[in-house]
Swiss-Prot record:
SUPFAM superfamilies: Actin-like ATPase domain. It comes from Lacticaseibacillus paracasei (strain ATCC 334 / BCRC 17002 / CCUG 31169 / CIP 107868 / KCTC 3260 / NRRL B-441) (Lactobacillus paracasei). It comes from the Bacteria. Its EC number is 2.3.1.234. This is tRNA N6-adenosine threonylcarbamoyltransferase. Fe cation binds at residues 115, 119, 306. Substrate binds at residues 137-141, 170, 183, 187, 276. InterPro entries: ATPase_NBD, Gcp-like_dom, KAE1/TsaD, Peptidase_M22_CS, TsaD.
């Protein structure tokens, strides 16, 4: 095995076309991201057909840019990696097809990567991981507590029963008049308001590690609709602060509960919602008091959203285990997180 392992990694599971070159699983040589946010904003969310069309238009350009920025050619590569699930089937297919084509044409191994494993392994760009560890993976499509005894070994110990946290942010943002994606603006407004509405903290009293955000989402929407019927104008800042407090309280509470049951050395907060300032502040402050020996790792802002570099980091683990894909690899939109490859 070469001392310098270079992996060309593809990510196209939703609305970002990203290709990266990652060295030895922890060094980013390039990480090109073509976002589609403006194309989806007028629809209030991601439209699968639009996403697929943009991936087709961007995938070759982004690949060329990633190789150029990294200063490498196909001959320098060790392997090609790609997200094959979970995600939007059409979007995934674009990345899978591109990766398979390049791997076949240049006689390179193909490494299949679970999208959510990628989010967790983005922490490898911050510092080496120490097992066992716990990950709180929070995004638009997932809210999961994952226990990892070792590299590549995933056990979901908590999951959402309905909406993911990121999905709730976008839907509440819409009712507050915030364009998609709403997370960053809801977070900003929340820091300007107060928790005056005291929305429900779902499942925080139940004896499990699962989440539920649909009731909270409905509570916010119903509060706003009721006020409009009465001709009242509610504070967007207070609504955002009250909603975010309810989300963050539950995420922190369940994470602490998991840490009591699963002693670990590190906690990774991963996924798009990991960019939320309110969540980071609450998690760091609470764990510093109650779990001072647990090292909290949050990937930098540029690596919390979907990106190719995180797929390269995950692929390095899979490559070490020789978990490779054949040319029959297909997109798996409902891929289970318990199977990283």
């Amino acid at each position: 095995m070469a001392a310098r392992e270079l992996i060309l990694a593809f990510e196209s599971s939703c609305d970002e076309t990203s290709v990266a070159v990652v060295e030895n699983g922890d060094t980013i040589l390039s990480n090109i991201i073509a976002t589609q946010i403006k194309s989806h904003q007028r629809f209030g969310g991601v439209v699968p057909e639009v996403a697929s069309r943009h991936h087709v238009e961007q995938i070759t350009l982004v690949t060329d840019a990633a190789l150029k920025e990294a200063g490498v050619t196909y001959d320098d590569l060790t392997a090609v990696a790609v997200t094959y699930g979970p995600g939007l089937v059409g979007a995934l297919l674009i990345g899978v097809t591109a990766a398979k084509t390049i791997a076949y044409a240049h006689h390179l191994p193909l490494i299949p990567v679970n999208h959510m494993a990628g989010h967790i392994y983005a922490a490898r760009f911050v510092k080496p991981l120490a097992y066992p560890l716990l990950a709180l993976a929070v995004s638009g499509g997932h809210t999961e507590l994952v226990y990892m005894r070792s590299a590549g070994e995933f056990e979901i110990i908590g999951d959402t029963r309905d909406d993911a946290a990121g999905e709730a942010y976008d839907k509440v943002g819409r009712i507050l008049g915030i364009p998609y994606p709403a997370g960053k603006e809801v977070d900003r407004l929340a820091h300007l308001g107060q928790d005056t509405f005291h929305f429900p903290r779902a499942m925080d009293k139940e004896d499990n590690l699962d989440f539920s955000f649909s009731g909270l989402k409905s509570a916010v929407i119903n509060t706003v609709h009721h006020a409009h019927q009465l001709g009242q104008e509610l504070s967007r800042e207070d609504l955002a602060a009250s909603f975010q407090a309810a989300v963050v309280d539950v995420l922190v509470h369940k994470t602490q509960k998991a840490l009591h049951q699963y002693p670990v050395k590190q906690l990774i907060v991963a996924g798009g919602v990991a960019a939320n300032q309110g969540l980071k502040e609450a998690m760091n402050e609470t764990l510093a008091v109650n779990f001072p020996d647990v090292d909290v790792i949050v990937p930098p802002l540029r690596l919390t959203g979907d990106n190719g570099a995180m797929i390269g980091a995950a692929a390095h683990i899979e490559w070490a285990k020789q978990h490779l894909a054949s040319e029959s690899l297909n997109a798996d939109p409902g891929l289970s997180f318990t199977h990283a490859s």
